[in-house]
Amino acid sequence: MTTKLTVVVAAVGLVLAVVPVRAHHAFAAEFDQAKPIKVQGSVTRWELTNPHSWIYIDVKDADKTVTWMIEGASPNNLYRLGLTKESLPIGSVITVEGYQAKDGSTRAVGRDIVFANGKKFFLGLMEAEGAPKQ
């Protein structure tokens, strides 16, 4: 009886531990497929941190400059896709396509970045649960 109870408690604990992890990786939890974005701006910061990288770009609007925070895949995934720390020097002008945060802020998940020379890179997060299919 004690062994069965231990197994049941352990199984329930594992199931409960998986739920927050799935929510963390669910595209639909934070981003809106109905809000595609395409912004062009200058890189002001690039954080290659786990579990996700962040690219900050200043986008000039009609009368002001707005900073967009673009979420990308982990540094390891980006390296495998061909992006390194040297790929995005501060001041680089890039175009980002992706999906805006549900809260309407200037935060988005990036799908692709395009450099001034036309070279395009996938940012690696579109396999997340609930993400739009390319």
Language-model-detected regions and their locations in the chain:
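Short aromatic-glycine-enriched beta-strand elements
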Residues: 49-59
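OB-fold/S1-family single-stranded nucleic acid-binding modules
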Residues: 101-125
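Short nucleic-acid-contacting surface segments enriched for D/E, G, S/T with interspersed K/R
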Residues: 80-96
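Short boundary/loop segments of OB/S1/cold-shock single-stranded nucleic-acid-binding domains
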Residues: 22-37
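Conserved hydrophobic positions within beta-strands
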Residues: 39-43
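Short, structured beta-strand/loop micro-motifs enriched in basic residues and often containing a Trp
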Residues: 71-80
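Bacterial N-terminal signal peptides that target proteins for export
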Residues: 1-9
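Bacterial N-terminal signal peptides
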Residues: 8-18
